[in-house]
Amino acid sequence: MARPVRVVVLGAGSWGTTVAGLAAHNTPTLLWARNSDTADEINNEHRNSRYLGDRPLPDSMRSTADLVEAAHEADVLVVGVPSHAVRSTLAQIANEVRAWVPVLSLAKGLEPGTRLRPTEVIAECLPGHPVGLLAGPNIAREIVDGLAAASVVATQDVRVATALQPLFASAVFRVYRNTDVLGCELGGVLKNIVAIASGMADGLDVGDNTRAMVLARGLAEMTRLGEAMGANPRTFAGLTGVGDLIATCMSPSSRNRRVGEYIARGMTVDEAVAKLGQVAEGVKTAPTVMELARDYNVEMPIAAEVEAVVAGRQTPEGAYRGLRKVAAGGEHEVA
């Protein structure tokens, strides 16, 4: 009888822990935690109190603080560290991961300086490995609580995606597949910026009509940039596009939405991130996205205002006044 596929997840934040829990219901799973106390808590108490409170984790899920041990065990490697830490983490195990092991990214940001997407960073660090991502409208705590959700495994080789789907699926967690890695990954990156704008709308109490406008026009910006970069525009109408956008902009648990709300209520960006206590990818990503928008000659007025707020050149109130001044042409035109 063939040995079960062993899944290793790097990063014991809320989403990394949740994905490890999903996999642990289907196959042997090991979660690498940077902090040994976190690993001990998962192994002994079957919970990750810092990120998921008292929610129980599968008894079968194991954790380690030894990165090399984790790399040696992987038949499938899932990279759940923040986008700015992907390269430094993988550099430590570049010679430890067996050949041809598929690698999935969970990160939803861009590498500072290089502007590379996480899958591109992974491909540089682990050449020759099939690379993809797992993404969708996934609020970690809801999934751990057993509420229904769906996600997408995106790899260029549909055979790899098909093989990976059942490792994470359950009766209440549907996993679809897609070969548009670029589009799926950009959806996860760009929606964080729109979520900050949505959070600012909440903090300013501008009303549901304005929030709906921000979501709809934000999706248009996401799609325009994605198509200009070579993604399939239809991808942005799916789970990794509009689906992830809605969840991130509407959920009280959304980190990027909360950062936007905190800023609109008078906090500085640093104070908002400190209160959050977790990574809000949109804060780090906004300047890089605007560089891409300029490179590809794509108008992104919402993203531009968010970037200005994050950089301290604009106030949330000024950002919304600026958006009201954007000329309205045909709905499917630029602005």
From Swiss-Prot:
Q: Which residues bind NADPH?
A: S14, W15, R34, K108, A140, R255, V279, E281
Q: For this UniProt record, give its keywords in alphabetical order, as a comma-separated list.
A: Cytoplasm, Lipid biosynthesis, Lipid metabolism, NAD, NADP, Nucleotide-binding, Oxidoreductase, Phospholipid biosynthesis, Phospholipid metabolism
Report the coiled-coil segments: none
**Molecular function via GO:** glycerol-3-phosphate dehydrogenase [NAD(P)+] activity; NAD binding
The Enzyme Commission number assigned here is 1.1.1.94
Taken from the record, one Pfam family name reads NAD_Gly3P_dh_C
Tell me the active site.
K191 (proton acceptor)
The biological pathway it contributes to is: Membrane lipid metabolism; glycerophospholipid metabolism
Where is it mostly found?
Answer: cytoplasm
Give its localization: Cytoplasm
UniProt KW Metal-binding keyword = no
User: Can the keyword Lipid metabolism be found in this entry's annotation?
Assistant: yes
Catalytic reactions of this protein:
sn-glycerol 3-phosphate + NAD(+) = dihydroxyacetone phosphate + NADH + H(+); sn-glycerol 3-phosphate + NADP(+) = dihydroxyacetone phosphate + NADPH + H(+)
Residues at which sn-glycerol 3-phosphate binds: K108, G136, K191, D244, S254, R255, N256
Give the GO cellular component terms, alphabetically: cytosol
Q: Report the record's Gene Ontology biological process terms.
A: carbohydrate metabolic process; glycerol-3-phosphate biosynthetic process; glycerol-3-phosphate catabolic process; glycerophospholipid metabolic process; phospholipid biosynthetic process
The record's annotation in SUPFAM superfamilies points to: 6-phosphogluconate dehydrogenase C-terminal domain-like (SSF48179), NAD(P)-binding Rossmann-fold domains (SSF51735)
| Chain's role | Catalyzes the reduction of the glycolytic intermediate dihydroxyacetone phosphate (DHAP) to sn-glycerol 3-phosphate (G3P), the key precursor for phospholipid synthesis.
Which family does the record assign?
Belongs to the NAD-dependent glycerol-3-phosphate dehydrogenase family.
What name goes with this protein? Glycerol-3-phosphate dehydrogenase [NAD(P)+] 1
The organism named in the record is: Rhodococcus jostii (strain RHA1)
